């Protein structure tokens, strides 16, 4: 743990921070010819043949077709589409798994193909145009609906701006019903995007969001739901929906500030379940705008939890300025954020205040706050 030097001799230390056929499988079909890489090469057939020869343990032929596939100029997105929208996805998974244990050539190809398929899935899932197309598919044929749902679930929170827009617009009841189901299936990744929109959407949409949050049942929503329920300007039917959802997510206290403080503490402790994509370089900080709708700002993942902790602590202080725990969490998260930020990184939410450093704010907050921060560091 790295100590934080604070003026006036106060030292605040902060704890910083595919797949294989069953054994013994015998393919009695005649050997398939090896396709050569050419302008006429059928990439789908090359992939199918690679899978086929891996599963029947023909490494030379598998390697030839795998190389031809990769040399054909196929993109990661095209490769992912071939796998995910084909009828042999299960066989692909088994072939990749078996291929890892075959000869060096096949093993390397299997790993490369698998890596590129995963990257392609990642790229496709978050593509805004593909998300738009996938939403339209929700009211198409049964097959289109299935593919649309799969794509949107893969997109996760990145689909939320367009999904929420359908709820806010409310112009197509059938599509809205399908979108609601998808949002509820996205589960925890949908919670913060929904919560930040709560104060700024119309009453009808507020009630719908409350119902979705209650159905998802993720406790992160608790302070936002209680805040809405206790707002004097909230219509009575929305208050009832908010309180109903609040109970469903496990809310018990009637103190909004304490709820935000508790969430700030969870972020400060860097609970992995609060990070939508722990393996990504960035995670989104969500805001809602009346005109632009839901917008995400990428924040470096290594400081994401501290940025969120500061945000939740600040919200707690809005409701209860004398909340000493919230103030201490804000100061501690600010110090840890500075410590965890890597060279060349910046914080697009709280910025890089060169005039007033985190140490300055820690000192200005007083001895008691610094002592609380020190206690957090050594816990």
Predicted features along the sequence, with ranges:
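Bacterial N-terminal signal peptides
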Residues: 8-22
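TPR-adjacent "capping" and linker segments in tetratricopeptide-repeat scaffold/adaptor proteins
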Residues: 31-45, 118-129, 133-137, 250-259, ...
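Structural detector for internal amphipathic alpha-helices that build alpha-solenoid repeat scaffolds
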Residues: 48-55, 64-69, 81-85, 107-125, ...
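Conserved small-residue packing positions in alpha-helical repeats and bundles
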Residues: 49-50, 264, 297, 331, ...
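Short, charge-rich amphipathic alpha-helical segments embedded
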Residues: 63-92, 157-169, 288-294, 314-344
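Inward-facing hydrophobic residues that define packing positions of alpha-helical scaffold repeats
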Residues: 65-66, 225, 229, 246, ...
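TPR/TPR-like alpha-solenoid helical repeat scaffolds
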Residues: 77-99, 237-251, 258, 325-355, ...
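Short coil/linker segments at helix-helix boundaries
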Residues: 78-80, 95, 262-312, 336-368
């Amino acid at each position: 743990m790295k100590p934080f030097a604070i003026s006036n001799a106060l030292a605040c230390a902060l704890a910083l921070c595919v797949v294989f056929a069953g054994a013994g499988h015998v393919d009695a079909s005649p050997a398939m010819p090896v396709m050569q890489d050419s302008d006429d090469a059928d990439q789908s057939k090359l992939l199918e043949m690679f899978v086929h020869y891996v599963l029947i343990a023909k490494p030379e032929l598998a390697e030839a077709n795998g190389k031809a596939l990769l040399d054909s100029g196929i993109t990661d997105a095209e490769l992912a589409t071939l796998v995910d929208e084909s009828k042999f996805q299960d066989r692909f998974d088994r072939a990749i798994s078996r291929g890892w244990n075959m000869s060096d050539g096949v093993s390397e190809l299997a790993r490369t193909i698998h890596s590129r398929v995963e990257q392609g899935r990642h790229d496709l899932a978050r593509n805004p145009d593909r998300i738009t197309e996938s939403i339209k598919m929700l009211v198409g044929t049964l097959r289109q609906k299935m593919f649309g749902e799969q794509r949107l679930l893969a997109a996760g929170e990145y689909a939320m701006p367009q999904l929420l827009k359908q709820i806010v617009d409310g112009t197509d009841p059938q599509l809205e019903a399908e979108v609601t189901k998808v949002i509820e299936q996205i589960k925890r990744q949908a919670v913060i995007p929904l919560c930040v929109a709560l104060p700024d959407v119309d009453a009808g949409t507020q009630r719908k969001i409350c119902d979705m949050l209650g159905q998802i049942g993720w406790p992160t929503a608790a302070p936002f739901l209680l805040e809405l329920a206790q707002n004097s300007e909230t219509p009575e039917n929305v208050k009832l929906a908010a309180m109903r959802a609040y109970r469903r997510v496990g809310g018990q206290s009637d103190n909004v500030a304490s709820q935000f403080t508790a969430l700030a503490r969870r972020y400060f402790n860097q609970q992995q379940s609060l990070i939508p994509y722990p393996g990504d370089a960035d995670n989104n900080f969500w805001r809602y705008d009346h005109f632009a709708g839901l917008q995400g700002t990428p924040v470096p993942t290594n400081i994401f939890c501290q940025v969120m902790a500061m945000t939740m602590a600040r919200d707690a202080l809005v409701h209860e300025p004398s909340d000493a725990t919230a103030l201490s969490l804000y100061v501690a998260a600010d110090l840890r954020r500075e410590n965890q930020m890597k060279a060349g990184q910046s914080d697009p939410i709280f910025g890089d205040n060169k005039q007033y450093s985190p140490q300055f704010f820690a000192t200005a907050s007083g001895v008691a706050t610094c002592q609380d921060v020190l206690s957090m560091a050594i816990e």
